[in-house]
Amino acid sequence: MSEKLDKHILKNGMVLLGERMEGVGSAAFVLALPAGAALLPEGCGGAGNVITDWVFRGAGAMTSRQVVDALDGLGVQRNSAVDSSNTVFSGALEASNLAAAVTVYADVILRPKLEDGQFTLARELAMQELAALADDPRQKVMLDTREQFYPWPLGRSPMGSE
């Protein structure tokens, strides 16, 4: 099987890469935005985790419930994460639903509602995830090791600190 990547650069500098795979009825996408933990201002550790939840709590003309229902209705298996360099949104779904899913993600990324009341809920969820590290020593060790061996701010935990 020969690998041929299609590449297109948008006017805003975003690079689109694609690979067709004959006989495959699914599609996957990754949107990597330059908004990682190392790029956040001092004192904003963990903000990326709050934001990745907050942006899904209403976007464009949709409420929080409508965003979730739209993605679920399209069959999107999704994830979002923050690393040192990027905030990443990814998904996999039936190929025929890709355009509709990208439209929802465009609203999430470009037109999030960012309502005050939803911020509190997103922040509380991020704090619960941080507290849950006490029950996951493997992840805690990995975060501590990363902080120890990578120079600041690259080693900064995307989860922040208490």
What are these regions (language model features)?
Residues 28-95, 158:
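M16/MPP (pitrilysin/insulinase) zinc-metallopeptidase core fold and M16-derived inactive scaffolds
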Residues 19, 40, 129:
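Acidic-residue sensor for enzyme active/binding pockets
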Residues 15, 23, 36-38, 96-98:
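Generic "edge-of-domain/loop-turn" microfeature
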Residues 1-26:
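N- or domain-start disorder-to-order transition segments that initiate the globular core
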Residues 21-23, 34, 150-151:
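Short connector loops/turns at beta-strand edges and beta->alpha or beta->beta junctions
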Residues 67-162:
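Acidic/histidine-enriched segments that form metal/cofactor-coordinating
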Residues 16, 49, 138-141:
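Short acidic/polar alpha-helix capping motifs at helix-coil junctions
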